[in-house]
Amino acid sequence: ILSGLVGSEMCIRDSGYICDSCATQAYEITQEALGEGRKRAGATKLNLKELPKPVEIKKFLDQYVIGQDDAKRFLSVSVYNHYKRLLQKDSGDDVEIEKSNIIMVGSTGTGKTLLARTIAKLLHVPFTIVDATVLTEAGYVGEDIESILTRLLQVADYNVPEAEQGIVFIDEIDKIARKGDNPSITRDVSGEGVQQGLLKLLEGSVVNVPPQGGRKHPDQKMIPVNTKNILFICGGAFDGIEKKIAQRLNTHVVGYTASQKTAVIDKNNMMQYIAPQDLKSFGLIPEIIGRLPVLTYLNPLDRNALRAILTEPKNSIIKQYIKLFEMDGIKLTFEDSVFEYIVDKAVEYKLGARGLRSIVETIMMDAVSYTHLTLPTIYSV
């Protein structure tokens, strides 16, 4: 910025001088730092009249998410039906279509968050991610349930009608499961208590939200937000739920057809048989399961899937690095052995697709550090 002082017009202030170029640059940096909310004001918004069909939604997801075809089909249809129902208020129809919130079950790094974020990107709706583990019942240390809507409002730049058509992804929903099959006698402020608190948000109600987040206070001005048209997508790893599924299937496989039914069950992929009663056995209360009627699962990623994720998606980490080096006039190439090494480490660490980025970042750190000093115009890893 100091180089801009030479030959530039100066803005004079009591405490000193600042050149016109610096003032402009400082303003641009400040505006960028204020967040994406203001940028969204001029961005394309959701057009219900031109809502993408399920096949178009899935095609868009295919560009960013490798595999998980079953989950993508479920999401595409459910999201389409959710936003299509918003047209009902203009139709004068007496039949009220209820919204279908979604719950996705899958291990870490299988693409749950990416799927939700990509759908929001396609539809141009406000999107926020909430970690269920930080939520507590009202009156206890932690974040209130209403903080979910505060985050959504912030993303929408406090445009309430826009926020009321947004998408909320609640991650780690399995971490607020109650500890036993029976209702808790003692206060479970971060488990069953949070599930109870989420009910009114999921089913659709008007919630008074503190404008700047934090706890509610008497005489504080509130922002009413109707959650009726907000799509809630919940995700969790549900570690150990395969045992619940197996127990349920074993109790059903009795009688003279037992051997035949047992042969059909794929013990290597028990997740495909997941049902709402398994979520109940895991510790979700029946009321919250009923408000998450669309249940889908994501398969663990094998070596082939991880290899494809590394290079094929539109925003893959490898393509990102190639673009970054290209901006410095350097052509970056990778040998196949490097890809195999990255996949080996990702399998070893058991972090799924999420682990790919950290491994690539570690490998590329030295190259990026010396990009402007030592690297030739063609660089191979």
Identify the residue ranges that each predicted region occupies.
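Conserved ASCE/P-loop NTPase catalytic core
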Residues: 9, 58-59, 79-295, 299-302, ...
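Glycine- and Gly-Pro-enriched alpha-helical subdomains that act as flexible
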Residues: 308-315
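Single conserved hydrophobic/aromatic residue that forms the stacking wall/gate
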Residues: 1-7, 12, 372-381
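Short conserved motifs of the RecA-like P-loop NTPase core
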Residues: 56-60, 333-345
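Dynamic helix-loop-helix/coil hinge segments at AAA+ ATPase domain boundaries and subdomain interfaces
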Residues: 46-73
